[in-house]
């Protein structure tokens, strides 16, 4: 919801004589009812409404944040430059929140504590060839793109894997789920949205947005003559995502054992991936220099790489760039959706990379391990048969999920319920980046029209009832909007898939992506989200605010 005035100020009266904050909050509540309250969304801590005194202060903070963003490199090439060519000559701050989103401290701690178990789960999944082939046997009937990935994985397995070491960079995405039916009138729980491996957008911007928000809150404290009382129990968590993930890549490069070999980053050269180039190229080179290594990081789109790489098939299966540069590590963020494979040349290049002895981040087995069917009953137990505590820790973050490849009564019932009540479910394909997710009436229509074979490429997931935060979104002028925040927890792992030995397993930081509560697709690559950060509050404070907001609505 757009607004042309400041936010909550107890002594600020508008021209009609009504307190401006009361008028603004009332309009937001009306908008909330229209935009999603019927889906079970619940409004939470409204600290933003308490910390801005008037419109002049809001505009000052907006310009202050923009200026500071430029000073710390929180910028990205604009998507529509004046000359029509995407270039880093024209740079502006990306879509960012002016203030950090409130989030329950207990749920954040839960997400951090489960991350190393999540890393190991997907390492074990990616190392189980038979499981992957079985998991995708129905998917490939209705998804030709994933069928090509499965075909490559089978080819590499049958030929013999030439590089047992593998790198997993993971981002596990969560929301704070509101369950109104729980004892005591409702409670919050951490629920997983999805897991991404390899193309994990956000780590480059995540740290700088946290830095910007700290600066804005410091400026507010100066304006207030001290920290506002409503922020007394808040805490901004430390975020070193860029450095930690770069460390995992640097260590992987070192493990290859050739100091002259290059690190090849496959990445599209557009604005949404600019921050990934920042942390890969600059941070890895910086780490190498500190350790006495000269790491040559080269960035290419998959299409360009397909014309310049070659494989030594008669020797040790080394991968070369331009015939002379041996490749130690390939970090793959390009080639995750069909549009990034316009010709057979891209498929040939990806196959060549998978057959090589270069260490991959990730290899194709990790790409397949992101099947959303891992949440189905019995799957986690398969990979941790003797560790019920770890199984329970992981499963505590799952929401309801159903595979659609069967023709049994249970499958028919859940499909019929999703068609009747589409607001309670999400239909997901195996495509990453938020592009294979379907909602509401589009989902219901697809379920009615798909054949059994087509359904096998999808899963149904219970829709999460998120917390909706009142937040300033940086635009010109700034807007006050209802937003839903999704927290991404980063983790990294290096392991030997031939024997299961783990060499590195770490929690690496977090990113927050927020979107308007009335927007379904919120990924940065989809253009619907903005970069955010966290301000942690005790759950009791969040719950008190949530319950009072629910009563008001």
Where are these regions (language model features)?
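Preference for protein termini
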Residues: 1-553
């Amino acid at each position: 919801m757009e607004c042309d005035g400041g936010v909550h100020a107890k002594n600020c009266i508008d021209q009609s004589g009504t307190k401006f904050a009361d008028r603004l909050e009332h309009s937001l509540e009306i908008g909330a009812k229209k935009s999603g309250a019927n889906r079970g969304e619940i409004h939470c801590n409204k600290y933003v409404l308490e910390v801005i005194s008037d419109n002049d202060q809001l505009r000052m903070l907006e310009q202050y944040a923009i200026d500071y963003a430029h000073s710390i490199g929180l910028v990205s090439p604009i998507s529509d430059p004046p000359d029509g060519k995407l270039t880093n000559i024209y740079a502006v701050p990306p879509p960012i929140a002016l203030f950090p989103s409130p989030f329950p401290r207990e749920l954040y701690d839960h997400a951090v504590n489960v991350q190393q178990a999540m890393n190991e789960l997907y390492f074990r999944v990616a190392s189980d060839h038979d499981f992957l082939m079985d998991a995708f046997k129905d998917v490939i009937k209705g998804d030709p793109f994933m069928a090509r990935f499965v075909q490559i994985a089978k080819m590499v397995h049958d030929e013999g894997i030439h590089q047992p070491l593998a790198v997993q960079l993971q981002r596990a995405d969560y929301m704070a789920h509101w369950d109104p039916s729980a004892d005591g009138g409702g409670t919050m729980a951490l629920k997983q949205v999805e897991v991404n491996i390899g193309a994990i957008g956000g780590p480059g911007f995540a740290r700088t947005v946290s830095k910007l928000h700290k600066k804005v809150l410091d400026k507010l404290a100066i304006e207030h003559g001290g920290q506002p009382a409503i922020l007394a129990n808040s805490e901004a968590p430390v975020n070193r995502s860029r450095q930690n993930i770069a460390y995992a890549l640097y260590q992987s490069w070192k493990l290859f054992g050739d100091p002259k070999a290059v690190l090849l980053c496959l990445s599209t050269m557009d604005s949404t991936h600019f921050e990934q180039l920042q942390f890969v190229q600059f941070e890895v080179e910086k780490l190498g220099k500190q350790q006495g290594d000269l790491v040559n990081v080269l960035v290419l789109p998959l299409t360009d790489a397909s014309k310049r790489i070659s494989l030594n098939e008669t020797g040790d299966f080394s991968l070369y760039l331009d015939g002379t540069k041996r490749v130690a590590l390939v970090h793959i963020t390009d080639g995750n959706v069909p549009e990034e494979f316009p010709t057979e040349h891209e498929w040939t290049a990806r196959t060549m990379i998978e057959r090589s002895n270069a260490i991959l981040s990730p290899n194709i087995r990790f790409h397949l391990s992101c099947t959303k069917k891992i949440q189905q009953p019995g799957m986690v137990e398969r990979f941790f048969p003797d560790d019920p505590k770890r199984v329970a820790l992981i499963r505590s973050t799952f929401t309801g999920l159903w595979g659609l490849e069967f023709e049994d009564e249970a499958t028919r019932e859940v499909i019929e319920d999703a068609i009747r009540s589409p607001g309670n479910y999400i239909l997901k394909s195996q495509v990453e980046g938020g592009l294979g997710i379907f909602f509401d009436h589009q989902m219901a229509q697809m379920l009615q029209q798909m054949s059994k074979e087509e359904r096998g490429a999808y899963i149904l997931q219970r829709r999460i009832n998120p917390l909706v935060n009142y937040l300033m979104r940086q635009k010109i002028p700034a807007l006050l909007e209802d937003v839903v925040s999704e927290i991404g927890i980063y983790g990294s792992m290096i392991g030997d898939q031939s024997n299961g030995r783990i060499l590195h397993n770490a929690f690496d930081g977090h990113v927050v992506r927020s979107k308007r509560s009335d927007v379904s697709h919120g990924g940065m690559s989809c253009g619907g989200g903005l970069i955010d950060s966290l301000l942690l509050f005790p759950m009791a404070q969040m719950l008190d605010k949530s319950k009072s907001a629910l009563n008001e609505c």
